[in-house]
């Protein structure tokens, strides 16, 4: 440990966007269990459109129970001003960031055929799912490079939560598929660009995971899973994705930058 570091700096810090619920919540709790202090970003609303802190505060409580410190920050990742303020708040609170998990993501508010989908829906989904993480990574990567110069013995990693939709056609939610395909290329680009600084960049591709997002199509996927759409015939759980993030956080894949990790019950396998 660099002699300049104070005692308060010893615990690693991870940022998890969309960290209040679902996959993000599971990742945040998993990282807290590994000894990270955790920053969770969220942008939750109640059913009637009011800002909602309920899920974020529950996640904060569960992280604290692991003995970790947690900072909850409400921010819209698609907003440049929010991203800048968000990163500044992390710097002010913890003074470091060792890991960024770009997890925040949305589905279209209404599934619509490709020939009927609206530009407003496209802009919303691409803004949150692709533009947001693309430019948040830019901000955090620059900060990581600065840290790497000052503290060369630390390790820095970025994880993008993609989707099997990055390569699977779903014409009723084309904007979502395009956003996740973009995340795949974003991962390769940043892995290439940041390798010289020792910053590993990875993509995790979840399959059919039981979350709020998939609850609206549960009956459909129950049948597909029972019929064998995945070799492992069960719903994936947020904790399955969190375990993959854990392996990266522990440095077990540091020579595998740019790698895609499928957490999909074998969906990606081509079978006859």
Identify the function of each model-found stretch.
Residues 2-43:
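Canonical Rossmann dinucleotide-binding motif of NAD(H)/NADP(H)-dependent dehydrogenases/reductases
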Residues 137, 179-182:
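Active-site helix of classical SDR
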Residues 111-114, 118-123, 226:
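Substrate-binding pocket helix/loop in short-chain dehydrogenase/reductase
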Residues 2-5, 111, 228-229, 246, ...:
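Short C-terminal tail/terminal secondary-structure segment
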Residues 29, 142, 191-193, 254:
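Alpha-helical segment proximal to the catalytic Tyr-Lys
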Residues 163:
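Residue(s) in the substrate-gating loop at a strand-loop-helix junction
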Residues 195-200, 256-258:
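Short, small/polar-rich loop/turn modules that mediate ligand/substrate recognition or access, typified
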């Amino acid at each position: 440990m660099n002699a300049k570091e104070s005692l308060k700096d010893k615990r690693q810090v991870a940022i998890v966007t969309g960290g209040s619920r679902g996959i993000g919540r599971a990742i945040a709790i998993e990282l807290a269990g590994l000894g990270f202090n955790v920053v969770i970003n969220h942008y939750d609303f109640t059913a009637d459109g009011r800002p909602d802190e309920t899920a974020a505060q529950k996640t904060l409580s569960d992280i604290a129970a692991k003995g970790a410190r947690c900072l909850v920050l409400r921010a819209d990742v698609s907003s440049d001003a929010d991203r800048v303020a968000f990163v500044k708040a992390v710097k002010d609170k913890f003074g470091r960031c060792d890991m960024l998990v770009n997890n925040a993501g949305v589905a279209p508010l209404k599934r619509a055929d490709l020939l009927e989908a609206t530009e407003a829906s496209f802009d919303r989904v691409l803004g949150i799912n692709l533009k947001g993480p693309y430019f948040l990574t830019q901000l955090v990567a620059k900060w990581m490079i600065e840290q790497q110069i000052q503290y060369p013995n630390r390790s820095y990693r970025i994880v993008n939560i993609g989707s099997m939709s990055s390569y699977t056609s779903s014409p009723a939610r084309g904007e979502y598929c395009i956003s996740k395909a973009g995340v795949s290329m974003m991962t390769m680009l940043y892995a290439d660009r940041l390798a010289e600084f020792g910053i590993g960049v990875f993509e995790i591709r979840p399959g059919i995971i039981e979350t709020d997002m998939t609850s609206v199509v549960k009956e459909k996927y129950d049948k597909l899973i029972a019929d064998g759409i995945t070799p492992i015939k069960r719903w994936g759980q947020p904790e399955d994705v969190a375990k993959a993030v854990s392996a990266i956080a522990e440095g077990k894949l540091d020579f595998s930058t740019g790698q895609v990790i499928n957490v999909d019950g074998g969906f990606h396998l081509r079978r006859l």
